[in-house]
Amino acid sequence: MARFFRRRKFCRFTAEGVKSIDYKDLDTLKAYVSETGKIVPSRITGTKAKYQRQLATAIKRARFIALLPYTDSHE
């Protein structure tokens, strides 16, 4: 029987020593938003709860100011 070993998920923000997540840093925020525009959960990305809360708030702020779209482009 084959055993699959998953790579250990780690929090990128903890590793880089980030104090707070800025809503104007769009490159970082886009990495944590799915193709459909949903915020990717921490169980998939591996971010810690503290940073996941900051990330969600930053994404919501960026959406409100129209820096990020709420959904994907409908064609």
Curated annotation (Swiss-Prot):
Belongs to the bacterial ribosomal protein bS18 family. It comes from Saccharophagus degradans (strain 2-40 / ATCC 43961 / DSM 17024). This is Small ribosomal subunit protein bS18. GO terms for molecular function: small ribosomal subunit rRNA binding; structural constituent of ribosome. NCBIfam families: S18. Keywords: Ribonucleoprotein, Ribosomal protein, RNA-binding, rRNA-binding. It comes from the Bacteria. One of its GO terms (biological process) is translation. One of its GO terms (cellular component) is cytosolic small ribosomal subunit. The lineage of its organism: Bacteria, Pseudomonadati, Pseudomonadota, Gammaproteobacteria, Cellvibrionales. The keyword Lipid biosynthesis does not apply. Binds as a heterodimer with protein bS6 to the central domain of the 16S rRNA, where it helps stabilize the platform of the 30S subunit. Part of the 30S ribosomal subunit. Forms a tight heterodimer with protein bS6. It holds the Pfam family Ribosomal_S18.
